[in-house]
Every structure is written in structure tokens, then in C-alpha cells.
Amino acid sequence: MTRRKKMVERVTELMDKPDRIRNIGIVAHIDHGKTTLSDNLLAGAGMISEELAGRQLFMDSDEEEQARGITIDASNVSMVHTYGGEEYLINMIDTPGHVDFGGDVTRAMRAVDGAVVVVDAVEGTMPQTETVLRQALKEGVRPVLFINKVDRLVNELKVDEQEMQIRLAKVIDKVNKLIKGMNEKMYNDGWKLDAAKGTVAFGSALYNWAVSVPFMKSSGVSFKDVFEKCNAGDMKWLSKNSPLHAVLLDMVVKHLPNPLQAQDRRIHIIWHGDYNTPEGKAMVACDPNGPVCMMVTDISFDPHAGEVATGRLFSGTLRRGTECYIIGAAKRANRLAQVGIFMGAERIEVEALPAGNIAAVTGLKDAIVGSTVTSLIEMTPFESLKHYSEPVMTVAVEAKSMKDLPKLVEVLRQIAKEDPTVQVSINEETGEHLISGMGELHLEIITGRIKRDKGVDILTSPPIVVYRETITGSVGPVEGKSPNRHNRFYIELEPMDPAIVKMILDGEISMNQQAIERRDALVAAGMDKDEAKNVKAIEATNMFIDMTKGIQYLNETMELVLDGWREALRGGPLADELVQNLKIRLVDVKLHEDAIHRGPAQVIPAVRSAVKAGVLMAGDSLLEPIQKIQITVPSEQMGAATSQIQGRRGQVFDMLSEGDTMTIVGKAPVAELFGFAGDIRSATEGRAMWSTEFAGFELVPAGIVNDVVKDIRKRKGLKEQIPRPDDYLA
């Protein structure tokens, strides 16, 4: 029997035993060694040959990933590990570390219950370490720590044995500080990392060895051995006497929760329905006999089988032919064609897959990433996936030849389905297709894939920055009249309270919640009680509140009112960019009694023009995306590095020195960061390590805002003159 076939048999035997399953993600800052670690774990479990591990990049199955040497998508694989004489099924997802692919990390964290956080012993915690850790804790995913590249401390920094231990302890302290700062309750509930308890391991993924305190006690390998063997370059001895996969997977099995333990805690974080319903009880208990409840965390395209939806199954059992509904899509049943699990790029079919596993299924035509899939016709959907960064750059793409246009439209639809951090839209005026993404690299990869995988030749524009609009003052009531003059809507506008905006972004307030729960959360955040109980809709970080009382026909017209409001948010009056942080109160309405005179063609334009006019009256302002920058350089290069930030309308707000290196933390607008990579390299003679991460939107400075608005309007083919409120209300 082949090694692979044997592995598949062992995997399928363990699927029905949730207490023997561990769903884990491997997360880290870029280049801290996640994929090398994943490969060596697979080799240890007998999935790929040991010689190739670490160089095979089994998890990086995409050509682009292998060529660039970075992970772009999250990859799944199932394997078996023996611990204490028992076999355990480990479903592992390797995630990208580059800031532009943070969306993949968010999605992976929904599917898993535990995370191995990988940190480079020399570089320590970096911005992306912080981001991935925050995402894990937010999803209720328990972390353990692997400090990688320990050999570099000895061979490159030439530290002695005592200094090595001090440095490793510092990394643990830093990660614990992050956990405590992000969620003190979890930290106090035993999520604090502790080398003595075995929730931390040290080693080298590349050279295939690791140690942990419990392993040292049982095997007799000591820190002294580690130091001496690293010093002598004898990695073979270390990998033979303390193999990476044994130490790490032992830690995973012993300290990370199984689906039964995890779901009891996590369901309350990721699902806000009624816990006394059949689906609520089944998910908390991880019950294979309950209704099917699955959350789609990834969609990929298989040339033979079509769309493959991967996701975490929280209750029920999936079989071929199972009829499922996708909440929020058309009310038609999708029949599962194939049910399976992933082994790297390969999909292995299975007869049945019970709750607690990560499933790969075909046949869910209506699903997108983030969909709730269930055998019930109706259920409260899972909380939507909250991404920590937002699209900050856009490129326009067009097909080189007209005959490829239908194919391009289809490919863009597919990309929007596969990667929810990408926004695809069509510029109605020019007919261009616009793709918005997380950064230059993200857009480069997407446009490259359109050409390579999908075979469509395209032309792309240089990247453009994504702006937003918001208001700085309050105004109202503003009157919006329908074209036939028979319907009138009166609205008041004011900026959203920043505390409530944060709660919306963190997923603590949403329209999926029970109304009472939402009202109480808003009142606790300082909102007026009457407003809090009349929230009709939340769109991005905008809120619509109905403060009217007993107006005839309004109930049946409300959906059209909200459509008009949403249309106005899609393009503000200043630069036709998305509007954010806007609170609108509907305070009075006069409607024609005849339904034919208050249809969509009357109501939608009336509300839309009132909102746009109100936004102008309340001080419409332009916001630009900002990135946090962290640069680590030798001390003598500090001046060159800080001037790179300050010369780009940036600010430096922290400088930390450790030994002879300096870490500079600052922020700068995305618009000024084009070409930053090349400039920082040449300014510091290639000795800088840097990383960026999304840090929200800020007002464009008054001195340049008019020029920026003019440029955007010109690019979009809009009139140069900014409209006045009367243009909308006339």
C-alpha cells in the first residue's frame, strides 16, 4: 500500500472522533518561516519526503508562490500524528505573512481552533505578528508559540548560551504583552504563554529541529546541547535527537483545543443567533447529527470539478447529494456534488464528513467566501469576516482584444468570489473594470493570475489610491423631493461617534444581532436609547436611523428609502468615492397615498439627492488611506531611514534601540508610498528591514485637498466644478 493511500485511510478513520482532531493555523510575519515549518511537519508525518522538506514548499502549490518564495493563499492539509500511543488528526492551514494578503489570514482563523504563532528569534515580533495574533484572539483561536531560526542567534549574532536564553525569554514576554493588551480576559484564563508549561517551542524549521521544556525533560536534550550543536553547525544531531514535528505536534495536541472544547467557547464569539434553537445547540456541542452549519472560508477553482468551497463544518454531516441552502442568496437548494478534504493542492474524496472538520465541497454554486451554508431553509448567519485592512489601491484593467471581454468579466466575477478583500467594479462612464486591493503586491499578483491562469491578455493602468468621503459637521433637516413633487423626506446628518465606528469594525455591532442585544451595546457606547432601538440599517460604517412615528405607508416604502441611502453612500458628491462614518436620522416623511406615485423611480432619487446635498452642507471632506511603517536599521543609518518617512508627508512617533540596531515606527499616506521599497533600499544601502500595515483613513491636509479632488474628478471624467447642495435639491 502506498504511503499516501495509507495516510488517507488513517485520516478518514479519525474524522469521526472529534476529541482526536486539532484544527490549527500557522501564522507569522512574512519570512519568519511558516511554510518551511509546515513542510517539515508534513515530512515528519510521512506526507512528503524528508530530503525535500523546506525546499519543496509543498504548501506553496501556486507557481507564483514558488517563484517569489512567499505564500499568497492559505493552504490546507490533513495529517496524522501519534501522541501518547493515540493517533490524532491534524488539519493544518499555512497562511500568508505579507500584509497585502491579510484577508487569507482572517479567513483561515475562522476555520481553525488553535494557532502556532511563528516568530523569528533575531527579528522578534513585527507588525504583522501583531496583526495575525489580534485576528486569532478575535476569532477565539488559542495561540502557542514557536520561536524559529534560533541557530541565527548563535551563528549570526554570536551570542553566548546565557544571552541566547535571555533573548528567547524577551520574545516570549513581548508576545505575552501583546496577548494581554489585546484580551486580558483570555490572558488570565490561561492563554498566557509559558515555556515551563510547554506552550512555547524553540528551534529551526529549515534544519528540522525543535525543543520545548517538557521535551527536554523527557529526552535529556538541554539548552547547552542546542547552543553547542548550533555553534558547531551540527544540525543533523539536533534533528535526529529532537525532531521538529515530534516536538511541535506534541505541543499542538497537548495544548490546543479539540473541536468539542473549542466550539463550546467559539460559537458565542462567531455566531449571534439563539443558542436554544436546534442549530444553536448542535454547533455548541459540535453534533454530527444536528443540522448542517458550515462557514465557507475559501473558494478555489478546479478545472475538472469547477468551484471548490472550503470551510469549517460546525455541526451536521456532509454527504454527496446533501441539499444545502446559502443564507442571504437565492432560496434554492444547492446539492453537494463531492465531499472531501485537502492534502495540499490535492482534494481527496470521502463518503461522509462529520462536524469539527475542515471540508472541501463542490456543488455550492451560490456560495461566496463568508457564506453560511446550512441544511435549514432559514438560520442566523455567522458573523461576517472582519478584515483588519481595507482596499487602498485600484488598477483599471481592460481586455487587449474585444473577443476576450466576456471571458474577462467571468474571470473578475470569479476573483471577487475567491478573494473577498478584492473589490471589483465597473466604471460606467469609461467601461473600464476596476480592481481594488490591499497594496501594490496584491494587485500585481491578481493581474498576473488573470494573464497566467485564466489566459486573458489584459492592459492595466498604473495603481491609483482609493480615497473616502466623510462629513465633519452636523446639518438638518434637509428636504429631499421626489421628481413628481408628491413625496418628501426630511433627514438629519451627523458624523458617527468614533467609539461606535470601532465597534462596527470589530464586529461587536451588526444587523445580524438580536435587536435587543444591539440596542444595549449601542446604549452602553453612549448612544441615545431612542436612536439605538430604531436603527434600520448599517452599511460599512454608516448608520440609518428611523425616528419617525406612525407615518402611513412608510413601512412598505422603507426598503426603497434604504436603497436611495445606499446609492448615495456609493459615491459622495465631492469625488464620487465611498462615504463612511455617516449617521443619518429620518425625522419626517410625506408620502402620496397612491402606491403608483411612490414607486422606486420617485423614492430612490429623492432620498439619494437629500443625502448628497446634506453631505455637502455638513462639510464634505476627503479621507486618504494611511499605512503604519516599521523600519529596522543599523544605528548609523537611522537618519536616512527617518527622512524616508518624513519626506513623504509622514510622521515618526517612536524610536527603539536594541544593541546597535534602531527600530523606527511611523506612518505615511499610501499616496506617497509608491516606490518606497526601492528608495529605502538605496537610502540605507540595502540594510533596512521594513514592513507596512493598514492604519485607517485620515483627512487629506487642507493645503493639498483641492488639487487631489481636482485630479480625481478629472480622472473619473466628472465636471471640474464641485456640485453645490442646490444642484441636488433643485
UniProtKB/Swiss-Prot annotation:
CDD domains: aeEF2_snRNP_like_IV, EF2_II, EF2_snRNP_III, Elongation_Factor_C. Signal peptide: none annotated. It is found in: Cytoplasm. The keyword Glycosyltransferase does not apply. It comes from Methanoculleus marisnigri (strain ATCC 35101 / DSM 1498 / JR1). SUPFAM superfamilies: EF-G C-terminal domain-like, P-loop containing nucleoside triphosphate hydrolases, Ribosomal protein S5 domain 2-like, Translation proteins. HAMAP family: EF_G_EF_2_A (MF_00054_A). This is Elongation factor 2. GO terms for cellular component: cytosol; ribonucleoprotein complex. GTP binds at residues 28-35, 94-98, 148-151. Residues 19-260 form the tr-type G domain. Belongs to the TRAFAC class translation factor GTPase superfamily. Classic translation factor GTPase family. EF-G/EF-2 subfamily. SMART domains: EFG_C, EFG_IV.
